[in-house]
Regions:
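Active-site capping/gating regions of soluble enzymes
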Residues: 107-123, 133-263
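Short loop/turn segments at secondary-structure transitions that flank enzyme active sites
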Residues: 28, 86, 100, 168, ...
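Short, acidic/polar
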Residues: 5-6, 74-85, 145-149, 207-211
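Hydrophobic faces of well-ordered beta-strands that scaffold small-molecule active sites
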Residues: 1, 20-24, 60-66, 92-96, ...
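Gly/Ser/Thr-rich loops at beta-strand to alpha-helix junctions
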Residues: 2-4, 27, 68-69, 101-102, ...
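Alpha/beta catalytic barrel-like cores
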Residues: 1-64, 71, 229, 233-263
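Anion (oxyanion) recognition and catalysis
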Residues: 14, 56, 87-88, 192, ...
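Active-site beta->alpha loop and helix N-cap motifs at the rims of alpha/beta catalytic domains
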Residues: 31-124, 132-135, 139
Length: 263
């Protein structure tokens, strides 16, 4: 995530008349700062407001990704500070994600429910994305478990997107997963709910053929690493073309240790 990538999203949406989502994780943008320009949430929103003036036809949903306890923290109070700031700054969608919370499955459901209810108490118009699975590319839940989980969350609040493992898995700069269309078809036929909208994470580095496989099965996809790789490669190529030494840039990038953070 960078200023250039963010502007590219607005520009593409405006010129192609395509609705898109900007979905920042807590590592990237948060109420107390993040690794993207060290922006706090209000600073990020101010930047987006400027882009909206420049690209008036852009149709962008401002979203929060992985709103739950992160790898290094289990502090629930910090999650709610994020929620408060997001709602105050008019985020359209919040992804409630307690998959990394170090408790049992039932407790994850309960904490997810509390967060969803709190969000809608603060703003009933905020869209909800939710799921309890870590995206590992394997160990897919059975259809009955998925049905029960979706019904549980949908009884609390209408769910805009339900996060499911699809078999996709990003490793370094490659898509190493194997899309399981049969699994998703069985889920759709098993749940029989026209409001089920599936969100796929780790959807980077997919070919046109792989994207076509998802038609009618996946409603929305998240990408991130491939955009960072694209910007880095473009920067290096431009440096080579114009004879600019980029060794210091690469060293600074390596020392930042940011490549392993949740996108």
């Amino acid at each position: 995530m960078s200023e250039e990538i963010i502007e590219a999203v607005y520009r593409y949406s405006s010129f192609q008349n395509v609705p898109l989502m900007l979905i920042a994780s807590r590592n990237q943008i948060d109420w107390d700062g993040g690794y993207v320009n060290n922006w706090k949430t209000p600073s990020y929103i101010s930047f987006l407001s400027l882009l909206k003036k420049q690209y008036q036809n852009a149709d962008i949903l401002i979203c929060r990704d992985h709103c739950g306890p992160l790898f290094e923290s289990s502090k629930i109070k910090d999650v709610y500070k994020t929620i408060d700031s997001d709602i105050e700054n008019n985020f359209h969608l919040i992804h409630v994600d307690f998959s990394y919370y170090d408790v049992d499955y039932q407790k994850k459901l309960e904490e997810s429910k509390k967060a969803i209810e709190y969000i809608h108490k603060c703003n009933s118009h905020t869209l909800i994305e939710v799921g309890t699975d870590r995206n590992t590319g394997e160990n897919l839940k059975c259809v009955d478990e998925i049905r029960e989980e979706f019904s549980y969350f949908n009884s609390i609040s209408p769910i805009a997107f339900f996060v499911l493992q699809t078999g996709s898995l990003v490793k370094e700069i490659n898509q190493r997963g194997s899309f399981n269309g049969k699994y998703l078809r069985s889920i759709r036929s098993g749940i029989l709910d026209k409001d089920l909208r599936i969100k796929e994470h780790n959807a980077d580095y997919l070919s046109k053929e792989q994207l076509r496989e998802r038609n009618g099965l996946v409603n929305s996809m998240n990408i991130a690493p491939c955009l960072g790789i694209l910007q880095t490669m473009t920067t290096i190529q431009r440096c080579n073309i114009h004879g600019v030494n980029f060794e210091d840039f690469l060293e600074e990038s390596y020392r930042s240790k940011k490549m392993g953070q949740m996108a």
